[in-house]
Amino acid sequence: MKKVRVTVSDFMFEILKGDSEYFKIPLGKIGNTLFKYFIDKNLSKIELEESSGKKVQFNLSKENEDIFFDVLREKKADTEAELMRDIFFTYINNLRFKREEIIFNNTFKQIREAIKNNIKIGIKYHSTARIINPYFIEVSSKENRAYLFCYCEKNEDFRNYRISDIENIWNLQKEIYIKNKEYIEAIKKNFDPFLSYGNFIKVKMTEEGKVLYERVTQNRPKLVKEEGIYIHLNVVRN
């Protein structure tokens, strides 16, 4: 089993480490996924002193090990470390939602293909198998990550599922069931991860509560009007 060792800048390392934690994927798996993804794509070049920065090392998968040196020659990289550093550099020069799409490229492809062909898919999500009718993929601007909006037959309701949390996916040769087309369009136009569109609650806040509300930057309920304070009700559903 071949081990890859590469020095990256502190900035690059923090992004790679952050994505590993955010998407709950080991850094080695990210390295193998990126190597395979960028085989047929142009790479951005970066020069870095080998003595500076942080070390990243991981074992290549058997599939990647078999083609590693062919790719090294194809990319005209002088060293193994240079090749992987250029791959990492090309990867981090994307916003997080795009990096998510790179890491989970196969999942995105299968979902989009199912939507295009109007067919149902099966997914394993939070350790539970579900049959779903996929409608669209949307990026949450507050979280900078992608969700699949669908109708879940297990729950008999509409759901948003984080694409990065889909553990397995398979196609079903059954036509999508379009349930409540107007609602689907309304959600697409007023998207939020918690499907809070049309749900409102009235909250009376203390001054300390208002300060805490203003500090929240992610998934903060939208302020509708203030007489006290009115906010959208966000309900997390699995």
Label for each model-derived stretch:
Residues 1-11, 40-64:
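Short Lys/Arg-rich basic patches
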Residues 9-29, 62-82, 86:
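Surface-exposed, Lys/Arg-rich phosphate-binding patches that contact polyanionic backbones
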Residues 91-109:
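Amphipathic alpha-helical
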Residues 113-125:
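A short, Trp-centered hydrophobic/proline-enriched beta-strand micro-motif
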Residues 130-136:
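Short beta-strand-centered aromatic/proline hotspots
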Residues 144-149:
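Short aromatic-glycine-enriched beta-strand elements
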Residues 150-238:
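Surface-exposed, charged, gly/pro-rich loop-and-adjacent secondary-structure segments at domain edges
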